[in-house]
Structure formats: C-alpha cells, structure tokens
Amino acid sequence: MVSLMRLDNYIVLGEEVDRLQLKVEGIIETIFKDCDYYINQLRKSNAFKLLYRSSKDSSNFYKLKTSNLETGRRPKDMGQVMHNLLNDKIFNPVFGWNVRDGVFASSKILPFYGEPYIFFPAGKFEYVWSPTVIDLYDDMFDKSKLDFLYYYAPEKEKVAYSIQDLTEEQIETLIKNLQNMYQSDDFKMAVRSEHEISFKCDKYYIVNRFMTDDFEKYMLDLIYHPESESKYNPFK
C-alpha cells in the first residue's frame, strides 16, 4: 500500500511537471514570436546576457505591459521639471523621441524598484544608452561623475531650480556634454555594459526569471545557442 501511494505521488508530480512544461513552452513560443526582432538583435550581438527590468507587479509567469511613451512617464525619483528638461532640451533634439519616457532595462539586476524580471520589448524598437553614465538619476546628483554639473543646491529636488539660474552659456555646456555621452548604436556593448538602456517600444514583456529551475540559463541557451543539441533544458 505504501509503495502504491508513493507511486501515485510520483504520477501526480509527473503530471504537474508536464503541465508546467507545456505552459512554459507556450509562454516562450509567444515571446519569441512577438519579440523576434529583439531576440535576433541579441543573437547578432553575441552579448550572452539578458536584460532585466524591475517591477512592483507580481507574476509567477509573465505580463505584457504598455509603455508610457504616449502619455509620458512619471519619474520615480527625479523631479518632473528636470525630467521634462532632459527630454525637451537634451534627448529629443538628438534622438527624436523622449528618451526619459522610454522603458528602462539593464543587464544588471537591480531590485530597488521592485522584483527584477527578464525584459523583452515587443516588435520593432529603438534604444539609447551611455557608455559612461550607468544611471542618469544617480549621476546627476554625484559631483564626482558629472563635474560640469557644478552648480546645484544640496537637496536633490532643488537641482531643477538651480539649473534655471545658470547662464545660457553654462546651460549650453551642460546640454552638449550630456548629449555627447549618449548614443543609439552598438547594441552589444549596451547589453554588456550593465548601464541603463532606454527603449522606445509600444509594449513589452516582463518574465519571471524563476519560472523553472535555472530558467535564465534556459533562456540564454535558447537565445544564443538555438541550434545546439546540448543546450540546457530544465524539464530533462
């Protein structure tokens, strides 16, 4: 009787694994279909990294989310005045879109803004990043990193107002220095850098990185070694 009960448990467990496998494979099929442009860019880059985005939304599997490009993103830390100034005066004139309203992701896992999920932009996208600026909000308030931003009040929110007191020449210097720090190419280095990358996309997926055991390893192999017979499979 005991052995039969144990056998029943194994059968139930096996059925649960089969159901999970079908669900995960269905999710991966959907993401690879909707995000094929992004996945092809990752493969071409050979960066062998994933990008992550933190979210306070909770999901055991994945969520499809809409970006704030049309409505404008409400900044979590940076003041709205500074946020708008960066878009209007620095990023839009160079890249043609409000970079600070983009969807931010990084190859570095950052749990400060919620649970880190694997990030997949859907459809075509544009991106902007900096080889020197890891996180613009952090760097804007760190004198040692942006020495040209030398005039601001001690309280971080006052930065937006103290900048208004700069001369036109000083503002132009600030704008040019920031513009020169950003670029919209070299996707391989952008992914490898662990710096923030702003994506211009309409929709994107956040995928639970603990969906299965070693799920990140599974995704890395599926993306970067699609033809390999020895690629990792969490269900075997």
Where does each model-flagged region fall?
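Active-site-proximal loop/hinge segments that shape catalytic or ion-binding/gating pockets
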Residues: L136-K236
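ADP-ribose/NAD+-binding catalytic cleft of ART/PARP-like enzymes
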Residues: D8-N98, N208, L220-L222, S230, ...
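Short, flexible beta-strand-to-coil junctions
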Residues: R53-N60, S107-L110, F120-F125, S193-E194, ...
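Classical Sec-dependent N-terminal signal peptides that target proteins to the secretory pathway
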Residues: M1-S3
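Intrinsically disordered, low-complexity boundary segments flanking structured domains
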Residues: K33-R43, S106-L110, Q183-D186
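Sequence-level motif detector for i,i+2 pairs with an aromatic at +2
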Residues: N46-K49, G114, E194, D202
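ADP-ribosyltransferase catalytic core
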Residues: H83, N87-V159
